[in-house]
């Protein structure tokens, strides 16, 4: 806690050098000018809403990064808050980029149809015969140790969609958690201590971010031929460098600073590690804004005819009017799309006003976000509900088995008590069969009665011969046996 207090005191007392603030401010102005120009250019040629609404979200990532980095550079005490907001928009930009690629294919339905078509073709040949089969996604090392090859199918699209959206959800939740922990002084950014919240959130975020990037890379690898008309490699590399290289750049700066290897005059003038990172990001975003003008231009949309809500993809072979379109041949073709023709709609004006375009970006894009977030949460909750249901069923089954076992045990115990009881009573004393004559044979009974009478008589008269013959070393007195002296 003392280190955290000293850090806040240093951040409050520290101010960036004038030359650093001036240079970062110049790049900020350049970034805002070029990025806003590109955004308004897309809004003025807003003829393909399904693509452009998400493309604008990707373009706005550059000015957002630049503004937050400049604010953190000028006032280091809010660097944690700025970094959290920057990370939140990073996850949103990744979602927009994934949605943009899907829209360029023709939407979710056409993307799923494309994957089903490629997946059906992969069934025709064994998996080991063709290493570069299009319908199979093979994982690189070390992911191949944990995951089996993925076959293109609607399931694959759902995995990619879930992987990208989960990062946006987890990033937002961890950002809110970090703000709460920072308010209580237990966030400790950059410190790996058991009592700090930073290492735990960092582990969760790194895993979520890595999985989202992996899903995006696999989706790009599966659809790059279908996306050839938009030159996806340049767009993908530009986006990936902004999102992920900036993060690894921050890790490298922190590592070099902790090892004492940052001994340049510029690094020493920028005392805090976050200030070095913010200064570099301001310069990088100025360069990225220039690259965006060439990678995400609005000119292709301006050349389109009427505005359309969806896209129809046909092959260049059918551009001739004399050749009728064969839907089956188009569906089964493996070649990428070359000509994209819009639906003619005479009731819709060609283009929209900037106000209408902005409303569609926020409202229309928000509808997609809500739908995808609901889908992701459902996909995450349903397995948990099924697991809980199965667990409850197992507990109920175990309870029933225990009750059944106890019931059988009690029944066996009762049966054993009944079977252990003697079939004949062993009676002694006055109930002795020798005295009462319990034998069923009447002759024997009469003989015993006769002997009993003779015994009584002999005992009273002093004669002992008959008693000795009947009972050996015993004699009877009354109804009891006694030993003979």
Swiss-Prot record:
Protein function: Required for programmed cell death (PCD) associated with hypersensitive response (HR). Involved both in the induction of EDS1/PAD4 mediated HR and in accelerated cell death in the acd11 mutant. Not required for HR induction elicited through pathways exclusively dependent on CC-NB-LRR resistance proteins.
GO CC term (a single one): cytosol
Membrane spanning residue stretches: 20-40, 54-74, 168-188, 197-217, 242-262, 278-298
Highest taxon above the source species: Eukaryota
Alphabetically ordered keywords of this record: Cell membrane, Coiled coil, Cytoplasm, Membrane, Transmembrane, Transmembrane helix
Cytoplasmic-side positions: 1-19, 75-167, 218-241, 299-485
Comp. bias regions, Basic and acidic residues: 403-416, 476-485
Designated name of the protein: Protein LAZ1
Residue span of region Disordered: 400-485
Lumenal topological domain residue ranges: 41-53, 189-196, 263-277
BP GO annotations: negative regulation of brassinosteroid mediated signaling pathway; programmed cell death; vacuole organization; vesicle-mediated transport to the plasma membrane
Changes seen on gene knockout: Suppresses acd11-dependent cell death. Laz1 acd11 double mutants survive throughout development to flower and set seeds, in contrast to the fate of acd11.
Organism whose genome encodes this protein: Arabidopsis thaliana
């Amino acid at each position: 806690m003392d280190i955290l207090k000293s850090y806040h005191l240093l951040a409050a007392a520290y101010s960036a050098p004038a030359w650093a603030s001036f240079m970062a401010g110049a790049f900020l102005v350049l970034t805002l000018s070029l990025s806003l120009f590109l955004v308004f250019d897309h809004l003025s040629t807003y003829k393909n809403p399904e693509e452009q609404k998400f493309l604008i979200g990707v373009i706005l990532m550059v000015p957002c990064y630049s503004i937050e980095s400049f604010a953190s550079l000028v006032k280091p005490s809010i660097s944690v808050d700025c970094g959290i907001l920057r990370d939140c928009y990073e996850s949103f930009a990744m979602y927009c980029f994934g949605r943009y690629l899907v829209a360029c294919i023709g939407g979710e339905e056409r993307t799923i149809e494309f994957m089903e078509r490629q997946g059906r073709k992969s069934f025709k040949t064994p998996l080991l015969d063709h290493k570069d089969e299009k319908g199979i996604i093979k994982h690189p090392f070390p992911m191949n140790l944990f995951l089996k090859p993925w076959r293109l199918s609607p399931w694959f699209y759902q995995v990619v969609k879930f992987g990208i959206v989960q990062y946006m959800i987890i990033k937002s939740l961890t950002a809110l958690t970090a703000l709460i922990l920072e308010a209580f002084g237990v966030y400790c950014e950059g410190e790996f201590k058991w009592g700090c919240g930073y290492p735990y959130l960092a582990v969760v975020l790194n895993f979520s971010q890595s999985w989202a990037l992996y899903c995006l890379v696999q989706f790009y690898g599966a659809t790059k031929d279908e996306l050839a008309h938009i030159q996806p490699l340049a767009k993908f590399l530009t986006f990936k460098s902004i999102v992920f290289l900036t993060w690894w750049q921050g890790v490298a700066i922190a590592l070099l600073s902790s090892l004492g290897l940052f001994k340049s005059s510029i690094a020493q003038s920028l005392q805090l590690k976050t200030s070095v990172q913010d200064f570099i990001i301001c310069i990088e975003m100025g360069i990225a804004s220039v690259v965006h003008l060439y990678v995400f231009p609005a000119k292709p949309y301006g050349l389109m005819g009427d505005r359309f809500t969806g896209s129809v993809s046909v092959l260049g072979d059918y551009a001739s009017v004399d050749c009728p379109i064969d839907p089956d041949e188009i569906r089964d073709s493996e070649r990428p799309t070359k000509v994209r023709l819009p639906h003619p709609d005479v009731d819709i004006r060609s283009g929209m006003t900037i106000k209408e375009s902005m409303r569609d970006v926020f409202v229309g894009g928000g509808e997609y976000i809500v739908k995808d977030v609901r889908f992701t949460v459902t996909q995450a909750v349903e397995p948990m509900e099924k697991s809980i249901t199965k667990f409850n069923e197992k507990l109920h089954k175990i309870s029933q088995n225990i009750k059944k076992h106890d019931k059988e045990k009690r029944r066996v115990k009762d049966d054993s008590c009944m079977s252990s009881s003697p079939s004949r009573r062993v009676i002694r004393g006055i109930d002795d069969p020798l005295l009462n004559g319990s034998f069923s044979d009447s002759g024997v009974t009469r003989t015993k009665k006769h002997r009993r009478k003779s015994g009584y008589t002999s005992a009273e008269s002093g004669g002992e011969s008959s008693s000795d013959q009947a009972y050996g070393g015993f004699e009877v007195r009354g109804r009891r046996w006694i030993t003979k002296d």
